[in-house]
Amino acid sequence: MNRRSERIWIEFIMGSRKTSNFCWACILLLGSLGFLLVGISSYLGRNLISLFPSQQINFFPQGIVMSFYGIAGLFISSYLWSTILWNIGSGYDRFDRKEGIVCIFRWGFPGINRRIFLRVFMGDIQSIRIEVKGGVYPRRVLYMDIRGQGSVPLTRTDENFTPREIEQKAAESAYFLRVPIEVF
């Protein structure tokens, strides 16, 4: 969703609250709970899960390994659920021609750097750069080159843009900022 006028352009960035992240977090949580229950049932000698009789799985070594995988999966799942809860990576890009300032805001992990805020003068922006990496999983990322500060990504690296979409986005950004486009 974008808000745009002649002087101000605000582009909202979607964070980690994507459908794929929800699906992976649920699958990982359920799978790791299954592994942990099988490991615990092999330790107790009872059938906590009716699909696997505890007599078929010995606690040493299969039950220990299943418990380890279950605990590791719970840690990874809790990490995914935390990023979804905190909506890591979400924010906005605000381009203001009237004041001549570009503001980039993103949410990070809790702590000192929870709010990532970058403010740049439009005069310091050298160009809009498209970086294209081909292969089996092609990657197209849009960067804003800033004099003396390097490059700042304007798109997520995991977004799969078609060549037409990335070119259009680069052209819109370059036209609004009145800077050239570079392709690498």
UniProtKB/Swiss-Prot annotation:
Main location: plastid
Gene Ontology CC annotations of this record: chloroplast thylakoid membrane; photosystem I
Coiled coil: none
GO biological process: one example: photosynthesis
Pfam families for this protein: Ycf4
Phylogenetic lineage: Eukaryota, Viridiplantae, Streptophyta, Embryophyta, Tracheophyta
Protein name: Photosystem I assembly protein Ycf4
Transmembrane segments: 22-42, 64-84
Protein function: Seems to be required for the assembly of the photosystem I complex.
Topology with respect to the bilayer: Multi-pass membrane protein
Species assigned in the record: Piper cenocladum
InterPro entries in alphabetical order: PSI_Ycf4_assembly
Entry-linked HAMAP family: Ycf4
Similarity comment: family membership: Belongs to the Ycf4 family.
Alphabetically ordered keywords of this record: Chloroplast, Membrane, Photosynthesis, Plastid, Thylakoid, Transmembrane, Transmembrane helix
Keyword Transmembrane on entry: yes
PANTHER family per the UniProt record, alphabetical: PHOTOSYSTEM I ASSEMBLY PROTEIN YCF4, PTHR33288
Protein's cellular compartments: Plastid, Chloroplast thylakoid membrane
